[in-house]
Amino acid sequence: MAASETIEIRRETAQVPYREALDAMASRNAAIAEGTAPELIWLLEHPPVYTAGTSASPDELLDPRFEVVEAGRGGRYTYHGPGQRVGYVLLDLRKRARDVRGFVHALEGWVIETLADFGVESWRAEGRVGIWTRGADGREAKIGAIGVRIRRWVTMHGFSVNLSPDLAHFGGIVPCGIEEFGVTSLAALGREVTPDQWDEALLSHLDGFLARLDTPCPPEAA
C-alpha cells in the first residue's frame, strides 16, 4: 500500500494549455517510473480543446471549432474547457494491484462518491465509459468522462467532470462516440460548485480511492 502522504497534490487556478499538460504528464510519468519523482494528482482546467483518444473516428468530429489534439489515451473524442475540472492521476501501480480494469473502476467510484457530496446521484453504465446521471429533463446524460493510459505500470490522464462548462461546446463532437445521450453539468442540475469546492470534496475521498487500488477488481465489477 502506498500512502497519500507521499503523493504530490497540485491544484491549478489558471487554465493550463492542453499540449503543455500533455508534455508535463509524459515527463512526470517517465520520472515516476524511474523513481525520480513522486506520484501526482493534478487538478486543473484547460482552454477550449477537443482531444482524440486512440479509438476516435473522424466522422465523430462534427464541427472542429477548437483545436483538436491527439491525446494518446484510450477512448474517443472529448471536450475540455473552462468550467470543467480535469483530474490527471499519475500513480505507480507497481506499488498496488497491477490491475488496469480495477484502476478504472476505482477512478469511476472516486468521481461518483464526490458527486454524491453535492447531492448528485451518478453511476457507471454497462457498455458506456464515463459517469452518468439524470439531466434536468430527466433523461440519462453524461456528467463525467474517463480516459486513461498506462505506461510501465504508471498511470496517465484520468477524469473530467462538468462543473459549469458551456455545454454547447460539446456539439462539435460526438462525445465519447455515444450519439444517443447528451451531456449535463452540476450547474445545469442547479448545483453551483467552484473548482476549489470540487477539489476539497474529491481529496476528502482520496484515501478510500487509494485503498481500492490495493485489491484486484472483482469480475462482477467490470
From Swiss-Prot:
**UniProt-recorded Gene Ontology molecular function terms:** lipoyl(octanoyl) transferase activity
Which Gene3D superfamilies does its entry note?
Bira Bifunctional Protein, Domain 2 (3.30.930.10)
For this protein, the Enzyme Commission number is 2.3.1.181
Q: Main site of residence?
A: cytoplasm
In Swiss-Prot or TrEMBL terms, this protein is called Octanoyltransferase
| PANTHER family in alphabetical order | LIPOYLTRANSFERASE 2, MITOCHONDRIAL-RELATED, OCTANOYLTRANSFERASE
Report the subcellular localization.
Cytoplasm
Gene Ontology BP, a term: protein modification process
Q: Which residues cross the membrane?
A: none
Q: Does the keyword Glycoprotein apply?
A: no
One Pfam family of this chain? LplA-B_cat
Q: In which pathway does it act?
A: Protein modification; protein lipoylation via endogenous pathway; protein N(6)-(lipoyl)lysine from octanoyl-[acyl-carrier-protein]: step 1/2
Keywords in alphabetical order:
Acyltransferase, Cytoplasm, Transferase
**Catalytic reactions of this protein:** octanoyl-[ACP] + L-lysyl-[protein] = N(6)-octanoyl-L-lysyl-[protein] + holo-[ACP] + H(+)
**Active site (record annotation):** C176
Q: What else is known?
A: In the reaction, the free carboxyl group of octanoic acid is attached via an amide linkage to the epsilon-amino group of a specific lysine residue of lipoyl domains of lipoate-dependent enzymes.
Q: Which organism is it from?
A: Novosphingobium aromaticivorans (strain ATCC 700278 / DSM 12444 / CCUG 56034 / CIP 105152 / NBRC 16084 / F199)
* InterPro entries membership: aa-tRNA-synth_II/BPL/LPL, BPL_LPL_catalytic, Octanoyltransferase, Octanoyltransferase_CS
GO CC annotations, alphabetized: cytoplasm
Is Secreted a UniProt keyword of this protein? no
**Binding locations of substrate:** R73, G74, G75, R76, Y77, T78, Y79, H80, A145, I146, G147, G158, F159, S160
Family according to the record: Belongs to the LipB family.
> What does the record give as the function of this protein?
Catalyzes the transfer of endogenously produced octanoic acid from octanoyl-acyl-carrier-protein onto the lipoyl domains of lipoate-dependent enzymes. Lipoyl-ACP can also act as a substrate although octanoyl-ACP is likely to be the physiological substrate.
Q: Which residues form the BPL/LPL catalytic domain?
A: 35-214
